[in-house]
């Protein structure tokens, strides 16, 4: 009696290598369901191998630093430089050496439906996480570039008191005035897993804040646009004016401040 297709599918789920003899054995099974399951599992393994290769490539900066003797490498990234409203948020994340988290990438490349899952995976595996938040008022005072630096420095400061302290910083396209060895990496969130981890932490943290602001200030679509200048947001500005979380140094908010009595 031939093995049921259900049993074959269960056996295939345990296979992790394309060279597994089970593939060759099942290749002669003429049943359509078996061949479909066979191809599906082969495709899944190929995808896993490609993901493993991608993650390994994104550890190149970290691996080079481990060889130099560094032990606790922190990735640093920010989210929220461009929006018209809300804070800029930075995160500093130290992952265990050679840690790989499936699906972890530049947060802009991760489907929104997977943000929370990967965020939780980072939180579970990280040795240390720090978050820095600079509000719109300070952004207006010092400019967004300086505010981004302040958010990053605050994120690093948040690690004080935690068991693991960074001995090297990998920073997304920024250099910080701090006495810790560091490297600025252009598009770091797409090239370093540590920075990618910081990217998703900062992204989810800020999105949660903007969703809360959406409840406080309805009509601007903050939960969907995160404060960026979408059509809905601009219509909200026209209809309701500026809110306490809008950046008065950013256009068109700046012009609205000059031409109205809005606070």
Swiss-Prot record:
- Catalytic activity field: Endonucleolytic cleavage to 5'-phosphomonoester
> Might you give the EC number(s) for this enzyme?
3.1.26.4
* UniProt subcellular location: Cytoplasm
Residues the record lists as binding a divalent metal cation? 77-78, 172
Which Gene Ontology BP annotations are present?
A: DNA replication, removal of RNA primer; mismatch repair
Which InterPro entries does the annotation name?
A: RNase_HII, RNase_HII/HIII, RNase_HII/HIII_dom, RNaseH-like_sf, RNaseH_sf
Output the HAMAP family linked to this UniProt entry. RNase_HII_B
Q: NCBIfam families from the entry?
A: PRK00015.1-1, PRK00015.1-3
Q: What is this protein called?
A: Ribonuclease HII
Organism of derivation: Streptococcus pyogenes serotype M2 (strain MGAS10270)
């Amino acid at each position: 009696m031939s093995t049921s297709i259900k049993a074959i599918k269960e056996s295939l789920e345990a296979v992790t290598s394309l060279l597994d003899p089970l593939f060759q054995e099942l290749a002669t099974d003429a049943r359509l369901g078996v061949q479909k399951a066979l191809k599906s599992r082969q495709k899944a393994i190929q995808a896993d191998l490609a993901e493993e290769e991608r993650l390994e490539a994104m550890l190149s900066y970290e691996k080079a630093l481990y060889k130099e003797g560094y032990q606790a490498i922190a990735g640093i990234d920010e989210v929220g430089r461009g929006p018209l409203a809300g804070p800029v948020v930075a995160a500093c994340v130290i992952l265990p050496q050679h840690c790989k988290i499936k699906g972890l990438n530049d947060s802009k490349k991760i489907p929104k439906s997977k943000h929370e899952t990967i965020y939780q995976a980072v939180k579970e595996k990280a040795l240390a996480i720090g978050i820095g938040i600079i509000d719109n008022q300070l952004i207006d005072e010092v400019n967004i570039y300086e505010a981004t630096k302040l958010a990053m420095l605050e994120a690093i400061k948040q690690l004080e008191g935690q068991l693991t302290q960074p001995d090297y910083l990998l920073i997304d396209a920024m250099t910080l005035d701090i006495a810790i060895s560091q490297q600025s990496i252009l598009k770091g969130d797409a090239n370093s897993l540590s920075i990618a981890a910081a990217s998703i932490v900062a992204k989810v943290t800020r999105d949660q804040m903007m969703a809360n602001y959406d409840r406080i200030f309805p009509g601007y679509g903050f939960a969907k646009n995160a404060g960026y200048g979408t059509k809905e947001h601009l219509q909200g500005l026209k209809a309701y004016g500026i809110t306490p979380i809008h950046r008065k140094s950013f256009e068109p908010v700046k012009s609205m401040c000059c031409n109205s009595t809005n606070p």
